[in-house]
Regions:
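Phosphate-backbone binding interfaces of nucleic-acid-interacting proteins
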Residues: 1-111
Length: 111
């Protein structure tokens, strides 16, 4: 399927910094609850991410990540996930987070 550039631009993908990460034992699959700061325009949002194979909560704090910020919130057990944190699968299908190679300003939009 081919989409237009205008369609792509409808997906608002922004850069944020993880400020807290904690286990999410109520999730069906191993996951972490993340709090991500997207800067002044977007603010702080929450996300649930199945990333426990490669990341500990402590290692995630301060890490910059990309997330879709304009999907509707999604209830995951007792937790409301407000953004979709982006990653790609490794050779075993486990999620590897996507982020910049250098520190960049919070809230930057991917294009």
């Amino acid at each position: 399927m081919t989409i237009s550039f205008d369609d792509f631009m409808k997906v608002d993908i922004r850069l944020g910094r993880i400020v807290t990460a904690e286990p999410f034992p109520q999730a069906r699959k191993p996951a972490l609850r993340l709090t991500i700061d997207f800067g002044d325009e977007i603010g702080v949002r929450k996300s649930s991410a199945q990333i426990t194979r490669h990341y500990t909560p402590e290692a995630l704090v301060g890490r910059q990540v990309l997330a879709v910020v304009n999907f509707p919130p999604r209830q995951i057990g007792p937790f409301m996930s407000e953004v979709l944190t982006l990653g790609v699968p490794d050779a075993d299908g486990e999620v590897v987070l996507i982020g910049p190679g250098h520190d960049v300003p919070l809230g930057g939009r991917m294009f």
